Structures are given as structure tokens and as C-alpha cells.
Swiss-Prot record:
Needed co-factor(s): Zn(2+)
UniProt source species: Rhodopseudomonas palustris (strain TIE-1)
Known catalytic reactions: 5-methyltetrahydropteroyltri-L-glutamate + L-homocysteine = tetrahydropteroyltri-L-glutamate + L-methionine
Protein name per its UniProtKB record: 5-methyltetrahydropteroyltriglutamate--homocysteine methyltransferase
EC number(s) stated in the UniProt entry for this protein: 2.1.1.14
Cofactor note: Binds 1 zinc ion per subunit.
Coiled-coil portions: none
Length: 788
């Protein structure tokens, strides 16, 4: 190994940091404000303290290029909409500064609608903003588990500078002694993330109106002293057409002409530039950030084709996952680039914003010491980059201990028996195609299932969970703290389960569920019972707004030491003569909602989970279950960003589902549930899963999802959701019969089930009761119509 030294200190940059605070301080402040327990001034004071602490922590860890405007009270895309005045009329904004009431109305809706927005807490802070308005739509940020608020554009859309947040936070940092690099979402990506109610409106046609607003805020930042500004354009890693590429050239050409002395760091992440490389390199920018975790080889083409004076920001530490970097390996990769271009034209950075990882590993005191030594959270990743910079800047001796510790951690992880289980890898290697096939085709299975189950036409059921009341949450928390015994907690849960079953029988549902009161989370519940998973205490990441999630860490080979759900299913089925569904989370969803090991392909990890779930399915069938539901809520979320890579992902994802579901007899009915708003483009894969019954989210789109079935003859049974569980409103019988009649136009009566869109755990019992009583009545009326 060479000496790894250059003459000048290498800059360490972060593209963005977690906003929530080490102890979720932002969540607490937001929910207090929404509940009316604190003032706007209180909330803004907490926000300012979080920003100041963020800047201080970065500075202390050797970050020399510190971002500002990466903080948000809710979401950075919403911040951009507010900045450029893209505020739909419904929110009552008439120009001028945008109030927090308007901001949160866009994020969460107001009054009646607010309690039903996603799974957020239903609180409201009064203001003169119109009441009863819905939130903006929310969707996944690229292929992460973060959600953004979708910008809404109209044909007559105009833009104006309506918020000076980037300028205010730049000045705020400057007053504290930090000369930051402001971060803004770039104009082209911003427009591409948006939507218009008018399908004929090409959102990119709005670019000429939008760019002047960007020029105005960038000009103000430059006047305030900003030498560099970071513009995030992750759309450059997507499939783009020539018109979209031209939009980049137009926008950045105009910015450069108006602001020739402002240096722009154009940031791309979540993948490689691919066929957009030439477009990016032709832009009049001073710097380009590359994701070298997802696409390490693109650096060669950038160096070969790019301008020699282009500053390269090397995203070499994974901003999406929690694994510690192998620093000696990174040194070997980065040193030739630094020596070739010079230290002044290279920055070291995470692959993307650190928003997607927890704040501080040091808060974890209960993790296995070996596992902890393999991990790195946001603050640790900054330290890794500083160590790398030190080693490359002639300070090798000073960082030798850190380099040695990194090498040791990588070596122990590669060899650890905690990670590698020969029995699991041998079993995975022995999987055959026959194990992913049911014994008979659907038609033969359906005949046997109908004979066995004797269900009416249009059978009614729910998706799985029932309301998790405050009493249930309190009991769970008390049990976790040891305040109530296992036996007492179990008795309490059995009582809740029995009540839910009696209630379902009284309402008249045909197929019952046990309610899942014993489950904290649909992934964590299983991960805690599988080998190869670990859980943090403070490993929170933002999902949206105040909602934070604590993803499981999938660190090793996965197996199932003992049955996970059979005891609860047996107890529930003993209380009723009606069919009781076994309820499981599918392997693809468990994978996609976890921090996944990076030492094997994702498909390998998923196959291992599928084998564990297959064992559980077999045990449920052995115990007498006639129906087993395997939820794959996150199947679509795992789709790669580039369409050319979809087939590879869907092939192994479908194979894993079939592996876990195909070991049963023909007369055992396999259900699955998917909750997302479009699947027309993956209908082949959904059919290939070969579930006997699939339930899907369709009510909000008024059954538009079923348009796929006009041309595609879906063979199996399907339960299109007939009411939206995300809203507290109780739908009428007529609304649900109307939706069922729409479904009957696309599918045969024999295929249709009747169910809500999704699980009911976030709703109240009063809402659920009214809705399900009406749903059962709607099914009864449709049976009469069908019978003619």
C-alpha cells in the first residue's frame, strides 16, 4: 500500500443530516404544537436549537462543508413548494409570507380531514386557514422509506418567492460562526416530483416560470455571502427522455448566465448517472456529487469525460444504510482520484443525505458488542469521512488507530458465526423450482377451497389489524418496562382478542382475523422472533413529518427458531366456528422495511426470510388453518429506479413469495394484501405470485386500479378495498355498493371479495364499527343483485 498522502487537506462534506434530533426532539415539539399545548414560538425555538446542535456536531466531527436549509419542520419538498409559492387555492393563501398554519394544512389537512391523514397523530392547531381541507398527497422519496408531500400544479400555475427559509437559515448559521453551503431541491427534480390534476399539463412546461424564482433566492444567498450552493437533482439517476435532459440544460444555463460567480454543487444520488452522464457533465456547474456506493464504477467515465476543473464530491460512505465502512479499502479506491485531480478538486461525502440513517450509535447501549462494532450512524459516518480525509492529507499516523479498528471490524464481520449459519446457506442452496409451485393450478385449488370453506358469494373480511387503543399501547409499554408480568399481559391480550372476535361475529363478517393486538409492528414482531435480526432503542429515522420508524437490522443469516404466530392463531380459532385467517408479513416486505446486510445480494437475504416464513405457513396449516394471509405491502417499494432493472427484482421477489406460500395443500387458501396506489405496470408479477386471494387498495382511486383488468384477464380472486381506512369518515352503504358495482364491471362475481383498503389499527372502534356494519350490508345487497 502506498503512503496515501496529498499536500492539501481534503474537504469533508455532508449533503444533509437527520432533523429529528438524537431523542426525537422534533417529534415531541411538533406533536405538542399540533395538540395546542405549545406555541409557535416554542416550536421555532426547538427547531433553532436542533439546527444549531446539528451544525456544532458536524463541525466537531471534522466536516468542513456543512449544509444549511437541510432542516425541515415536515418535509424538504413541501418547503420547496412553499418557497416558490406553489400553494393550491384550497389552502387559502393570498400571497405574502406563508404561515405555519398554511404549511401544516398542506402537510396534514385541517380539522375533519386531519385525523385521517396517513398514520399521523390527529391533532390540530387552530388558525384562519380553511377548515376541512385535505393534506397534499404523500408518496415515497425515490426508493427510500422517507415520504414527501407531492407538489400540485395547475395549468395557470405561477410562482413567486414566498419563503426566505434558505436565506434565513444560512444567516442563522453564519451568526453562529458556520459558513455553510445552502441546500435546495433542484428545479427539474422538483417539477418531476409534482403532479397536475389536469393530465394534459406537462409539468416541465412550467420550468421557464419556475427558474426565475430559483435565480432570485440564489442571488440573495450569494449577496449574503454564500460562495457555493448545493442543488439536489436526483432525477438525473432516473430514466430520462431527451426533452427532460434539455430541461436540465435550459434551467442550469439560465442560472449560470444570471449568476456567473455563484458556484453550484449539483448533487445526484440513489444511483448512477448512466445515460444521463453527458447531460450532467455539459451543465455549467462548478461541482458534481456522485453516488459511488450504488454506482462505484461511474467515477471512471466522469474522470475521462468531465472538465478537469470540475470539483468532484465522492459519495463513498453509505448514506442509506447503517454499516461501518471499510476505510483501508476506501483509501485504496480514493487515493488515485485525489492524486490525479488534486485535493482542492475533491470532496469526501456520504452517498446521499444522512436523513436516512439514525443520529448516533453511541446512544445504543444494549446492542451485542460485535454487532455494534460493525455499525455506523450519522455522526459516526462523519467521523469515518474525517478519518479518510486525515489519512489522505498526510496525517496517517494520527488516524492509524481508527483505520486499524475499521479493518478489524470488517474482518470480524466477514468471519463471524453470528452472521454466517451453514445450515441456513445449505438449505437455501437446496431450494428447487418445485418448491415455488403449488400442487395444482388455481382453478383446481379454488374448487377444493370452495367445497371446504362454504362461503357465500362476495365474502366479507378485514385485512388483519383492529384498533390499537390507548389502553393497548399503555399495556404494551408497561409490559416492556416490566411493570406488568408476562402472564398478566397475555391475559389482557387474550381478552382483547376474544372481544374482537365476538364483535366480528356480531357484525356478520364471513372470515375473521384475531386483531393483531400482540403485535407492535408488522415487521418488528417477526424480526424479534427470527435469528439474524437485531433491534435498536434509539435508531429512529424520519418517515414523514413527526412519524419516525426504527427499522430492524438484518445482520446475518435468517432462520426461525420456533413458531411465531401459531399459538395466537389456535387461541383465536378456538373461539369461533368461522374461518380465522393466519396473519403473516411476507419476506419482501420484511426485507424492504429493514436495514439490510450489504455482504450478500438482497435476493439472498430475501430467500432466507422466505424459507423461515414457509416454515410458519406449514405450522399454521398443520394446526388447522384453512386460510393464511401473507402481506406484501412493500413489494412495489422495492422496484429499482431504472425500468430496465425491474424484471430482475420482480423475478426474485415473486419467487420468494411463492417459496413461502407454496408448501401447502391445494385446499388451503393463500391470501396476500398490497397497499399502494398503482400496480397496472406490474400486473404480470402480481398474477405470477399465484395467491388464491389478493386484497388491494382501490377505494381512493374509485376502482381505477381495476382498469388493468379490462385488458388483463386476472385469473384468481380479488378483494378491491371498498372504503378508505385512512379517513375517519364512515362511508355509506350506497358508496360501497357503487364501488362494488364498478368492480363487477371488470371482474366476475365469483372472483370478488369485500374488504376495507388496509388494516384498521390506526382507527377508532366507533369509526370501524360504523364502516364494517355498512360494508357487510353492502355485500348483502350486492349478493341479492347478483342472484337476480
Amino acid at each position: 500500500m502506498s503512503s496515501h498522502t496529498v499536500s492539501t487537506s481534503l474537504a469533508v462534506a455532508t449533503l444533509g443530516t437527520p432533523r429529528i434530533g438524537p431523542r426525537r426532539e422534533l417529534k415531541s415539539a411538533l406533536e405538542s404544537f399540533w395538540a395546542g399545548k405549545s406555541t409557535e414560538a416554542d416550536l421555532l425555538k426547538v427547531a433553532a436549537a436542533l439546527r444549531a446542535a446539528n451544525w456544532a456536531r458536524q463541525s466537531a466531527r471534522g466536516v468542513s462543508v456543512i449544509p444549511s436549509n437541510d432542516f425541515s419542520l415536515y418535509d424538504q419538498v413541501l418547503d420547496t413548494s412553499v418557497m416558490v409559492g406553489a400553494i393550491p387555492e384550497i389552502y387559502g393563501w393570498r400571497g405574502g409570507p406563508v404561515s405555519l398554519a398554511t404549511y401544516f394544512a398542506m402537510a396534514r389537512g385541517t380539522q375533519a380531514e386531519i385525523a385521517g391523514h396517513g398514520c399521523a397523530n390527529g391533532h390540530h392547531h387552530g388558525d384562519s386557514t380553511p377548515q376541512g381541507v385535505p393534506a397534499q398527497e404523500m408518496t415515497k422519496w425515490f426508493d427510500t422509506n422517507y415520504h414527501y408531500m407531492v407538489p400540485e400544479f395547475s395549468a395557470g400555475q405561477s410562482f413567486q418567492l414566498a419563503s426566505l427559509k434558505p436565506l434565513e437559515e444560512y444567516r442563522e448559521a453564519k451568526a453562529l460562526g458556520y459558513d455553510t453551503r445552502p441546500v435546495l431541491l433542484g428545479p427539474v427534480t422538483y417539477l418531476k416530483l409534482g403532479k397536475s390534476a389536469d393530465a394534459r399539463l406537462d409539468v416541465l412546461s412550467l420550468l421557464p416560470k419556475l427558474v426565475p424564482v430559483y435565480i432570485e433566492i440564489l442571488g440573495r444567498l450569494a449577496a449574503a455571502g454564500a460562495k457555493w450552493v448545493q442543488l439536489d437533482e436526483p432525477a438525473l439517476v432516473l430514466d430520462l427522455d431527451d426533452r427532460e435532459r434539455l430541461a436540465f440544460r435550459d434551467a442550469y444555463g439560465q442560472i449560470a448566465r444570471e449568476l456567473p460567480h455563484l458556484d453550484i454543487m449539483l448533487t445526484t444520488y440513489f444511483g448512477g448517472l448512466g445515460d444521463n452522464l453527458d447531460t450532467a457533465l455539459a451543465l455549467p456547474i462548478a461541482g458534481l456529487h456522485l453516488d459511488l456506493v450504488r454506482a462505484p464504477k461511474q467515477i471512471n467515465a466522469v474522470i475521462a469525460k468531465g472538465p478537469k476543473d470540475l470539483v468532484l464530491s465522492l459519495g463513498v460512505v453509505d448514506g442509506r444504510n447503517i454499516w461501518r465502512a471499510d476505510l483501508p479499502d476506501l483509501l485504496d479506491r480514493v487515493e488515485p482520484i485525489v492524486q490525479q485531480r488534486g485535493a482542492e478538486r475533491v470532496q469526501l461525502a456520504p452517498s446521499c443525505s444522512l436523513l436516512h440513517v439514525p443520529v448516533d450509535l453511541e446512544l445504543e447501549t444494549g446492542l451485542d458488542p460485535d454487532l455494534k462494532s460493525w455499525l455506523s450512524f450519522s455522526l459516526q459516518k462523519m467521523g469515518e469521512l474525517s478519518t479518510l480525509s486525515g489519512a489522505l492529507s498526510g496525517d496517517r499516523a494520527a488516524v492509524q488507530d481508527q483505520l486499524s479498528a475499521s479493518a478489524k471490524a470488517a474482518a470480524t464481520r466477514r468471519k463471524s458465526p453470528k452472521v454466517h449459519d451453514m445450515a441456513v446457506s445449505s438449505r437455501a442452496a437446496a431450494v428447487t423450482p418445485a418448491m415455488t409451485q403449488r400442487n395444482s393450478g388455481f382453478a383446481a385449488r379454488a374448487t377444493l377451497q370452495h367445497q371446504r370453506l362454504q362461503l357465500p358469494a362476495f365474502p366479507t373480511t378485514t385485512i388483519g389489524s383492529f384498533p390499537q387503543t390507548a389502553q393497548i399501547r399503555q399495556a404494551r409499554a408497561a409490559h416492556a418496562k416490566g411493570a406488568i408480568s408476562d402472564a398478566d399481559y397475555n391475559t389482557f391480550l387474550r381478552g382483547e382478542t376474544a372481544r374482537a372476535i365476538q364483535w366480528q361475529e356480531k357484525v356478520g363478517l364471513d372470515v375473521l382475523v384475531h386483531g393483531e393486538f400482540e403485535r407492535n409492528d408488522m415487521v418488528q414482531y417477526f424480526g424479534e422472533q427470527l435469528s439474524g435480526f437485531a433491534f435498536t432503542k434509539e435508531g429512529w429515522v424520519q418517515s414523514y413529518g413527526s412519524r419516525c420508524v426504527r427499522p430492524p437490522i438484518l445482520f446475518g443469516d435468517v432462520s426461525r427458531p420456533k413458531p411465531m404466530t401459531v399459538g395466537w392463531w389456535k387461541y383465536a380459532q378456538s373461539l369461533t366456528g368461522r374461518p380465522m385467517k393466519g396473519m403473516l408479513t411476507g419476506p419482501v416486505t420484511i426485507l424492504n422495511w429493514s436495514f439490510v446486510r450489504d455482504d450478500v445480494p438482497r435476493s439472498t437475504a430475501c430467500l432466507q426470510i422466505a424459507l423461515a416464513i414457509r416454515d410458519e405457513v406449514g405450522d399454521l396449516e398443520q394446526a388447522g388453518a384453512t386460510m393464511i394471509q401473507i402481506d406484501e405491502a412493500a413489494l412495489r417499494e422495492g422496484l429499482p429506479l431504472r425500468r430496465s432493472e425491474w424484471k430482475g427484482y420482480l423475478d426474485w421477489a415473486v419467487e420468494c413469495f411463492r417459496l413461502c406460500s407454496s408448501g401447502v395443500k391445494d385446499e388451503t387458501q393463500i391470501h396476500t394484501h398490497m397497499c399502494y396506489s398503482e400496480f397496472n405496470d406490474i400486473i404480470d408479477a402480481i398474477a405470477a405470485m399465484d395467491a388464491d386471494v389478493i386484497s388491494i387498495e382501490t377505494s381512493r382511486s374509485k376502482m381505477e386500479l381495476l382498469d388493468a383488468f379490462k385488458t388483463y384477464k386476472y385469473p384468481n380472486e380479488i378483494g378491491p378495498g371498498v372504503y378508505d381506512i385512512h379517513s375517519p369518515r364512515v362511508p355509506s352503504v350506497e358508496e360501497m355498493t357503487t364501488l362494488l358495482q364498478l368492480a363487477r364491471q371488470r371482474l366476475s362475481d365469483g372472483q370478488l371479495w369485500v374488504n376495507p383498503d388496509c388494516g384498521l389499527k390506526t382507527r377508532g372502534w366507533d369509526e370501524v364499527q360504523g364502516a364494517l356494519v355498512n360494508m357487510v350490508e353492502a355485500a348483502r345487497q350486492i349478493r341479492q343483485v347478483s342472484a337476480g
